[in-house]
Amino acid sequence: MGLKEDFEEHAEKAKTLPENTTNENKLILYGLYKQATVGPVNTSRPGMFNMRDRAKWDAWKAVEGKSTEEAMSDYITKVKQLLGEAAASA
């Protein structure tokens, strides 16, 4: 299985993460996903009254230097880690 296919499989698995997954971890996944699928941030930072979108933008901006392949690989690793933690606490 290639990296892209593995990434897509883990993107589906990420949807099964428990509801108690921290916002911090969700934002890390969001940033890596956007970097892997879109590339560097291509929008302006949302205003200060739009906290949710601003946090998502910041998470994406934080991984801006990663290549598509690095972002995919890091995303897969993070999903595996979170699924492992969820299984251990179940």
Curated annotation (Swiss-Prot):
Residues 1-16 have a biased composition (Basic and acidic residues). The keyword Phosphoprotein does not apply. GO terms for molecular function: fatty-acyl-CoA binding. Residues 1-20 are annotated as: Disordered. Keywords: Lipid-binding, Transport. An acyl-CoA binds at Y30, G31, L32, Y33, K34, K56, Y75. Binds medium- and long-chain acyl-CoA esters with very high affinity and may function as an intracellular carrier of acyl-CoA esters. PANTHER family: ACYL-COA BINDING PROTEIN 1, ISOFORM A, ACYL-COA-BINDING PROTEIN, ACBP. Belongs to the ACBP family. This is Acyl-CoA-binding protein. It comes from Ricinus communis. The lineage of its organism: Eukaryota, Viridiplantae, Streptophyta, Embryophyta, Tracheophyta.
